[in-house]
């Protein structure tokens, strides 16, 4: 998993999203991806909300301070010690949401704040079946935003979208 993420490079979809986000001061990316590829494609961290966290660093479960992942993993693997936060003593783990762990409250609040202010909401490459994130398009429509869904397969929200494109992401953005 670690090696896959290290070797991964942004694809045409990541680059197109970066172009969209960077062309509009108020644009914001809400992502479930944990691979840092949006940042690698050029989207500033300040314009990204990572709902499921990020697999490229670690953070304290209590105070949420970030740590470089390499040294944290090394201590755990070499010594079998669960790393603790230098600030508050809390447990440090990879900054992703694990099964059974609740969604990050701050990330969800930021996402909802961005959604209620948007006039266009685009979903790209998601089946829209896992909640609470799957409810974001409906929230956007309820506040009056236009909704675009780009996904290879149909979703349960296609009927409320203003535009639906059932194609591979690379095909949709091939000329961007």
State each model region's role.
Residues 1-176:
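Conserved catalytic alpha/beta core of Sir2/sirtuin-type deacylases, generalized to analogous enzyme cores
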């Amino acid at each position: 998993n670690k090696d896959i993420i290290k070797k991964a490079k942004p694809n045409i979809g990541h680059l197109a999203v970066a172009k969209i986000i960077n062309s509009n001061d108020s644009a914001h990316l809400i992502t479930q991806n944990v691979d840092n590829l949006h940042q690698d494609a050029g989207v500033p961290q300040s314009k990204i909300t990572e709902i499921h966290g990020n697999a490229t660093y670690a953070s304290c479960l209590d105070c949420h301070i970030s740590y470089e992942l390499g040294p944290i993993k090394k201590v755990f693997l070499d010594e079998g010690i669960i790393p603790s936060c230098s600030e508050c003593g809390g447990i440090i783990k990879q900054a992703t949401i694990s099964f059974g762990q609740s969604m990050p409250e701050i990330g969800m609040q930021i996402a909802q704040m961005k959604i209620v202010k948007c006039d266009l909401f685009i979903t790209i490459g998601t089946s829209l079946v896992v909640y609470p994130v799957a409810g974001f398009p409906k929230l956007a429509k309820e506040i009056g935003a236009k909704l675009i869904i780009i996904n290879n397969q149909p979703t349960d929200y296609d009927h409320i979208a203003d535009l639906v494109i059932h194609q591979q992401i690379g095909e949709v953005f091939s000329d961007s």
